């Protein structure tokens, strides 16, 4: 996006009222953040500038302070990524994305007189507050020692682990598990003692196990979260709430934030005295396959046909979940084209792949009619 387009984006976001604005990575992101701020104030909105240095910290800020939304600009070399944020620190849902795209296309912005234009204020020390919130959210730590390696350049993660009393080792030490933050801090990567990198679903399952162990009995998850979490919660006396309209404000940030998840898991290790490998072994099997299925007809027509074919499927605003004998299937329309997003899950990789092939074929049959 060029400067004028980013300014228009700021004007479109001004309908939120207050827009938290942050950036990281270089002069390009900083310059475009200025353009976005100008767009917000020109449309009568109020800009809250902050020094949060990651998209995850910006999400936490909106959640913690109850802000109506925000925008974070991340620059990595020549690539610039924009992260619009809604209330509660949530990413934009599909309907909100469509409205925003429509407003940008039509340039449907408010342009008040000078006396009614917006303004801005500042929030400082966001990263320090974000780190403290992540550490304190993990609850009580146990007395067992925990040693971890951290990927180079992960200063924030190192600070959080040290705060919890975790011993840090060099990354290449044999037999020492490792962690890293990815996707702008929103995802946690884990390598166990044998050097195996665990899947995103396994890390999510371990985070849920840590929350249940800390005393929480309800897990608040998006509709597409793995069905294996329901088995985990049932076995440990908990329940799963699939939230169609976002997770409640301030609730279980460790399920969508890498730093919060790392702190939660470290305290879990300190309470149990088990290794990460042992904790992963006690989780239900969860192998996932993802596929985008292109369509010649419309997404809604094929989704409707699949819904009629499987009347017992759980229909939700974002898609539908189908529980079969060997696993589960999540089907949702793609946001940017005539296609379906299919996510299949089974205890074994072979099962997940077979389910993925099966649903792809079923969708293809309806698409051919």
Show where each model-derived region lies.
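Short glycine-rich phosphate-binding loop at a beta-alpha junction
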Residues: 17-26, 144-151, 217-223
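Buried hydrophobic packing segments
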Residues: 9, 36, 58-61, 157, ...
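N-terminal small/polar loop signature for handling phosphorylated ligands or for N-terminal nucleophile
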Residues: 4-82, 160-197
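Phosphate-binding and adjacent anionic-ligand microenvironments
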Residues: 183-186, 193-196, 200, 206-207, ...
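Short, basic/hydrophobic alpha-helical segments
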Residues: 9-16, 114-118, 206-215
């Amino acid at each position: 996006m060029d400067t004028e387009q980013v300014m228009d984006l700021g004007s479109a976001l001004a309908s939120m009222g207050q827009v938290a604005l942050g950036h990281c990575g270089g002069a390009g992101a900083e310059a475009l953040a200025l353009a976005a701020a100008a767009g917000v104030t020109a449309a009568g909105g109020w800009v809250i500038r902050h020094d949060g240095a990651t998209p995850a910290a910006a999400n936490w800020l909106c959640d913690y302070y109850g802000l109506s939304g925000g925008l974070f600009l991340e620059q990595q070399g020549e690539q610039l990524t924009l992260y619009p944020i809604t209330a509660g620190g949530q990413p934009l849902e599909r309907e909100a994305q469509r409205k925003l795209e429509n407003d940008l296309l039509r340039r449907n912005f408010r342009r008040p007189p000078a006396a009614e234009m917006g303004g801005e204020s500042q929030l400082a020390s966001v990263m320090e507050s974000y780190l403290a919130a992540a550490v304190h959210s993990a609850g009580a730590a146990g007395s067992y020692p925990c040693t971890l390696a951290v990927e180079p350049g992960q200063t924030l993660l190192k600070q959080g682990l040290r705060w919890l009393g975790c011993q840090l080792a060099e990354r290449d030490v044999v037999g020492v598990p490792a962690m890293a933050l990815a996707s702008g801090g929103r995802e946690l990567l884990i390598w166990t003692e044998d050097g195996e990198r665990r899947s995103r679903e396994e890390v999510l399952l371990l985070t849920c196990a840590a929350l249940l162990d800390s005393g929480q009995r309800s897990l608040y998850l998006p509709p597409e979260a793995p069905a294996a979490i329901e088995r985990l919660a049932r076995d440990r006396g908990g329940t799963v709430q699939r939230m169609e309209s976002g997770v409640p404000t301030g609730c279980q940030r460790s399920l969508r934030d890498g730093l919060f998840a790392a702190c939660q898991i470290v305290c879990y290790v300190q309470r149990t005295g088990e290794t990460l490998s042992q904790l992963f072994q006690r989780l239900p099997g969860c192998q996932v396959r993802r596929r985008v299925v292109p369509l010649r007809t419309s997404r809604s027509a094929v989704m409707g046909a699949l819904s009629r074919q499987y009347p017992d499927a759980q229909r939700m605003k974002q898609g539908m979940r189908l529980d079969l004998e060997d696993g589960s299937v999540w089907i949702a329309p793609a946001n940017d084209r005539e296609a379906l997003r299919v996510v299949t899950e089974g205890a074994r990789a072979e099962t997940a792949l077979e389910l993925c092939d099966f649903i792809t074929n079923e969708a293809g049959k309806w698409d051919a009619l």
